[in-house]
């Protein structure tokens, strides 16, 4: 099973990335709210074509997540169902490629939420804005960003984000994956 620290991180992903209306469960309405927030953070820069593409992608994500986690088939994924899905998934997950399809599809979307300039790299200012816009409790943003970039040796691009997101979900101990929660390891 998962240790308490892993459960805490999985709970963060549930609360922060999925349960947008904070009612303790995930349903389609949370995905709709996510699109609204994404548009706000990106200052309405989402074209109609991008919006339609994102909506279709999120509909696919919702179907996949629901199919994996909605044990009682009530069109709602509870925290308990979500945790049970991750306990099963993490037991066999060895890389980003082993993550559920809905989760892999979400990674570029989440990265774009940080990379508001669209240049493919999240700089310190974008990371600071991300922490502020999403109310992350981050006491020292530059220090956290320094962990993300390994002291400037690594570019904070989509591949780095994938690695950190995988570690956030699967690592049994505090490591660089914590930075996506605004925390140092």
From Swiss-Prot:
Ca(2+) 1 binds at residues 19, 21, 23, 25, 30. Ca(2+) 3 binds at residues 115, 117, 119, 126. SUPFAM superfamilies: EF-hand. Signal peptide: none annotated. It holds the Pfam family EF-hand_5. Ca(2+) 2 binds at residues 70, 72, 74, 81. Keywords: Calcium, Metal-binding, Muscle protein, Repeat. Residues 5-41, 57-92, 102-137, 138-173 form the EF-hand domain. One of its GO terms (molecular function) is calcium ion binding. The sarcoplasmic calcium-binding proteins are abundant in the muscle of arthropods, mollusks, annelids, and protochordates. Like parvalbumins, SCPs seem to be more abundant in fast contracting muscles, but no functional relationship can be established from this distribution. This is Sarcoplasmic calcium-binding proteins I, III, and IV. It comes from Branchiostoma lanceolatum (Common lancelet). The lineage of its organism: Eukaryota, Metazoa, Chordata, Cephalochordata, Leptocardii.
